[in-house]
Amino acid sequence: MLGLFNYNYLIMKYARLTKEQFEELHQEFINFLATQSITAQEWSDIKLNKPEVAEQELDVFSDLVWEGVLKQVQYLEHISANQLHLFHCLENEMRLIALKVKNQDIDLTTKEGFNWFRDNLLSDDVEFFSAKKTYTEDKALDKFKLIQQGAVITKGDLFLYFEKLVSK
């Protein structure tokens, strides 16, 4: 056992951060190691002589970062070629506003397609749907699964805009 964690039972809940994300969070990772009384020299030794332990430390840190981020998520968006899914993550439920473009020639992931969408928003070629869903036992994991499927964290501008249209 190293530090605070028993690695015999460690299973990642989320996903390992990318190399770029680790580089961005370099100081936070140093602080994470320090909370476990692991010095820079000891970390170098662990990476060299116990790579499986180093991998597990990276996984634990990744999960801690994800947990913190997911607690803060209020809005998610997933844009595909013909659909727009906008999520508002409330305390006890997730609200969804979905928009579907019937015209298969329109691709919302392109500038031209999104401009068409904006100009034809109230036409019969665009369908609106809304729904609510209560979370499972693990609200953070519900959000993470949406991110894994391609949703991105946003400030909610699109959700708030379309919420006004849908409620009229």
Role assignments for model-derived ranges:
Residues E42-I46, E77-N82, K132-K133, L158-E163:
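Short coil/turn segments at secondary-structure boundaries
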Residues L108-V126:
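Charge-rich, low-complexity intrinsically disordered segments
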Residues L121-K168:
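Glycine-rich, aromatic-bearing surface loops/beta-hairpins
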Residues K13-H78:
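N-terminal interaction modules that seed assembly of large macromolecular complexes
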Residues E42-W43, F61, V65, V69, ...:
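Generic structural signal of hydrophobic/aromatic residues within well-ordered alpha-helices
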Residues Q21, V53, E57, F61, ...:
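Non-membrane alpha-helical secondary structure
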Residues M1-I11:
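N-terminal amphipathic/basic-hydrophobic helices that include classical n-h-c signal peptides
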Residues A54-E112:
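Long, charge-patterned amphipathic interaction tracts in eukaryotic proteins
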